[in-house]
Amino acid sequence: MACGSVDPQGLLSPPLSSARLSNVPHVEGPWFWSCGQTNISCKVVNGKVVEVGKWPWQVSILFLGMYICSGSLIHHHWVLTAAHCLQRSKNPANYTVKVGVQTLPDNSSSELLVTSIVIHENFINHMSHDIAILKLKYPVTWSPFIQPICLPEVNFKPSIGTMCWVIGWGLEKAKGAPKTPYSVQGVAVRIVNNEICNHRYQFLLLKNQKKFIGNDMLCTSPEWGLDTCQDASGSSLVCQMNKTWIQMGVVSWNFGCGRRQFPSIYTSTSHFTQWIKRQIGDLKFASMAVPSFLSPFILTGYILLVSLGSLWLL
C-alpha cells in the first residue's frame, strides 16, 4: 500500500492508538492472531499523507525524556534493544518507552515507565553480546498500530543475500541528515557473509585477534544507498517469511553511513533466543500449525518465536 500519491481528503483517520495500561487479563481484538503482522493505513502527519501501522513493533527509548535509541516490542511487558543504548545509567527510573510512535519528536504519546533493565552479562562495548531487554511497569495492550515482532528459533539465520529491512528513525543517506520531524522508516539491506565482513574490518583487529565479527553478529550491506546511521541503535532488522516479519537482528554499529564497503553490524537475535527466554522466565511452548485457530486468550502474555513452516508460542 502506497500513500504518497493518495488524495488526503477523507483519509483523516483517528490518532494512533496509545498503549492502554491495565492490570486485568488481556483480551485481544479479533484482528490479532500472531506476531510479525502489519495493519497499514494512511494518515495525515504534518500535512503529508503517510503509511502508519507498517512497523507496529517499533518503539522509541528515552533517557530523562530525550530520545536515545529504538527498540522493539516482543511481549506485553518487554522491549528488545541494544545493550550499548543503556550504558548511560543502570537505573531503570531514568528510562521511558513510547509505543505506536510515527514521527520524532513525538509529544502526543505517553511515556511508559520501565521497572528493570537486563543487559547481557557478557556485553563488551559493541564488540560482543550487544543485547538487552527492558521491562515495562504495565503491560501494553495490542492494537492495529501496536503489535509485537516475532523472534527466530535458536541459531536460525537468514541465507546470504536475503533482502531484509532495517526499521528506525536514524536512517539516512550517506550525505545529509534527516530533517525533524521525520517518520519511522524502513530501508532494504542484504545479508552479507560474516567472513566478508571480517575481511572488511580486519584493520580493527587487535593483536592476536583472529576475527572481529563473531557468531553472535550479523552483517548487511545497503541495497539502495540507504543504511543505518546515527540514532539507529537498537533498531530492528526484520525479514519477511511466509507473510510474517521476524526480527533477525538488533542494530549495533557501523563504520560511516551508507558505505557499501563497510557492512552494518547487528546482534543476531537467534543467537540469544535462549537468553531472552531465561530472562523473561514465564515462557511456555505450544506448537501451532495454524495460528489463526488459536484463541486470543491463549496468546496473552507470551512471546512468539517463529520457525520455518510453523510458529511457536512461548
From Swiss-Prot:
Transmembrane segments annotated in the record for this chain: 293-313
Membrane-topology descriptor: Single-pass membrane protein
Active site: H84, D130, S233
Subcellular location, record wording: Membrane
Keyword Coiled coil: no
Manganese is among the record's keywords: no
Pfam family, one: Trypsin
Gene3D superfamilies the record matches: Trypsin-like serine proteases
Region forming the signal peptide: none
Alphabetical keyword list: Disulfide bond, Hydrolase, Membrane, Protease, Serine protease, Transmembrane, Transmembrane helix
Classification via PROSITE patterns: TRYPSIN_DOM, TRYPSIN_HIS
Disulfide partners: C69-C85, C164-C239, C197-C219, C229-C257
Protein's recorded name: Serine protease 46
